[in-house]
Amino acid sequence: MFIFLLILFVCILLLPSCARADEAPAAHQRRSLQSLHDAFSSAANSQYAYSIAHRLATDFHLHNNATYGGRQAGSDAEHAAADYLADEMRRIGLSDVEKAAAKCDKWQFNGASFTVNGKEYPVYTYATASTVPEGITAPIVYVGRGTMYDYEGVDVKGKIVLVDIDQRADWWITYPMLEAEHQGAAAILAANVGGFGQVADDALNSQDICGPTSIPTCSIGVRASREIRAQLPHGTVLGTLKVDNTVEIGKGTTYNVTGRIRGKSSEFQILLGGHYDTHFWGFQDDCCAVGLVLAAAKAMLDSGFEPENDIVFCLHGAEEWGSSYTQFDWTVGAWEMINTLHPEWVGKTLAFLNFELPAYEFATYTTTYSAPEMFSLLRDFTTRYPYAPKPQGCFPDGVLTEGYQTYTYSDDFSYYAAGVPSTVNGFLLQKDMEHVHPFYIDYYHTQYDTPDTYNDAVMAFNLRYYGALAIYIDQMPALQLDFTAQYTRLKDALDADIFAQSGADAALYRSVVESLLPPAQALKTRIDTLNACYLAADEAGDIVEMARLRQAGRPLIRKVLNAFRYCQKYLLGLMYERPIVPHQAPQETIALCQHIIDCLVRHDPATAVDQYVATVNNCLESYSIYFSPAVIDTLNDMNWGAGNQDNLYFGTNINFDKAEVEEASRSVYQRRAEIGGDFAKEIRVYRDAIDMEKKKLRADVHKETEAIGWLKDLLG
C-alpha cells in the first residue's frame, strides 16, 4: 500500500498545473472517473435484471417441457430464447446485435414418464437415448450403486435397472450408465442419495453426460426410488419407461447472442457474458446471469457511458452440454465462439467477465475466480480503487482477494485456455477451493432452482461491482496483468525430489523460472505507475495528460495480451478437469505410484487402496476400480482415442496423458484384504508406469523451460 501511495504522490507532483486543464478547449472535456461510476451505479437496476431472469425461467415458450422446463443445446426452446434475447438487446439500444451460429449436438427433452403398477413417477433425462413411443416395459432390478460388483449374480438383460448415486462422493452418472449398458440393461434410473438434489426427496437432477448417448438414462426422486424398491422383494415388478428425448449428433446449432456499445476505439474490447441454456428452470443457473449482463448493458447506455474500448455483451448457448462422446462436453458454445467464430478476439479482449448464479448469497463472503495473472488487478480494484462498490445487505465479510484460480466449470475457462484474461464471480467453491457451497448439494440442476432462491441485495451488488470493474478495466490506460503470479505458479509446481528421480534438470528449471521474476516485476511496476499517474491526472482534472497516458498504455496492453496468450498456450495443462502446469501430471503420478509400491512391498494393500490407488490419474483410477474394463475403454477412447481428438473442446492440446495402471488398480482393490500376498505383478505395472511417467516429465520440463525463456523475452 505504501508503494502505491508513493507512486500516486509522485505522479501528482509531476502533473502539469490544474490551470492548464481548466484552459483546455471544451471539446476535450471529459467526465471524471467518479462521475462515470456514480452515473452507472445510479442507473444500475437489479429489478430489471430480475425481470429478465424471471421471464427466462418461467415463460413456458422458452422451455421444452411445461412440467420441468429445460432449454438444452440446439433445442427449439434455446432458439426461441436466443430470439427473445436478441430482441431485448435491440430494445435497450445495443448496436451490432447478432445471433452467432455455432455447431453443437442437439438435445431436446420433450418429456418422460415412469409408471409402476399404475402409478406414474416423475423422471428427467440426460442427453441420452430415447425409448420407442410406446416405451419400454420390463422388470425393474435394483443394483445398488451400479458398479460391476453390484451385478454379480444378477441378470439384467433387457431390464430396467435402478441405482443409487452420489455424483460428488463417488462418480458421474456416466459410469453406472455405461456399466448398465454393458450388462445388457434396457434403461437405467438413478436416485441422488447424496451429492446433488438434496433439497427434497422428490428432487430430480440432471447433468452433462460426458459420454455417448448409450441407453435411456433418467433421474428419479429418492422417495420414488424407495417406494419402488419396497415392492421388489415381493416378486417381479414391471415398469414402463417412456422417454421422448431428441439427441442428434452433429446436427445442432446453438446461438451466441451478442450486442455491443461502441468505444472510442475498437482496437480492444471488454466482454461480459453468461449462458442462457438451462437444466430445468435454471433461474440462478444461469437466467440471473443473463439478467445481470443485460442490466449492466442497460445501465451503461442509460448513464451515457462512452467507453474507451468496445464493450461486448455475449450470451452463450450450449454451456451445460453441447457435444456427445467427450469428457469435455460443456461450455461448447463459448469454446466455439472464441476458437471458431471469433478467434481474433484473442489478443483483442482485455477481459471476459463471466457470470454464474449471481443472485444467491452462498456464504458470508464472496470471491472472484480468475486467471492468476489477474489476481493483482482484482485485489487492487477491490481494496484500493476508490470507486469499487462494497456489499450492502449481503456478504458481511466482504470480497476476498487472496486470489482464486479459475476452474473448468464455466464458460470463462474456454476463453482463458484460448488466451483471453477471464473471470467469473465466485459461485461454486468455498474459499478453500475444495468444498462446494451448500447450494450445489441442494438446489443445483434441480427443479427447485426457481425465483424463490432470488436475493436482490446480491444481484444489486454483483451488478454494481462487476459493472464498475468493467469500467475500471476500460478506463485504465494499461491492462493490469501481473506475471509475477505466473512466476509463483511455476515455482510452486516444482517437486525437486521427483525431478531428481526422473532425471529432469531441476536446477535449470528453477533458474529459468527465477529469471522470469525481474522482467515480470519491472513490467508490473511500469503498469502500476502508469495507472497511478492516470488516477492522479483524473483527480487533478488534467484531460490532456490523461489522453497522453492512455496512448502510452497501448503498447503495454499489446505486450501483456501477447504474453498472456503465450502463457496459456505453453504453460497451461489439464489433469482431467483440474488446471495444472503440464509437468505436474507425471510428477504427481510418479509420487502416487511410488507410495503404492511402498505399501505393496510392505504387504499392506489396504493402505494403498485407502490412500493412493483411486487418486492416480487425478481420480480416474476410482472408475477403473469399480467399473468393467469395457466401460473404461470407452472413457479412454473419449479422452485419448486417435479418432476423437477433434472432440475435446477446451481440453484440446492441454489434456494430460494418463498412466496405464488400470489392471493393477483393479487387482489391488480386489485383493485389498489380503495379508502377506505376493503383489509382484502389480508392483511391476506401477514401476513400468513410473518409468513412462519419468519420460513424460522430462519432455514436459524441457518444453516448459524453453517456453519460460521465451516468456521472459516477451515481458522484457
Language-model-detected regions and their locations in the chain:
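Bacterial Sec-dependent signal peptides at the C-terminal "C-region" and cleavage site
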Residues: 15-25
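Active-site-adjacent substrate-binding region
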Residues: 252, 358-488
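Noncatalytic luminal/extracellular "stalk/propeptide" segments of secretory-pathway proteins
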Residues: 47, 54, 58-160
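Acidic/histidine-rich catalytic neighborhood of metal-dependent amide-processing enzymes
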Residues: 168-175, 179, 256, 278-375
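Second-shell loop/turn segments in exported
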Residues: 36-44, 62-76, 142, 164-177, ...
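Extracellular/luminal Protease-associated
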Residues: 75, 124-216, 401
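C-terminal non-catalytic alpha-helical accessory regions
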Residues: 464-465, 473-716
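Soluble metallo-hydrolase cores and metallopeptidase-like ectodomains found primarily
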Residues: 35-37, 119-153, 207-283, 294-306
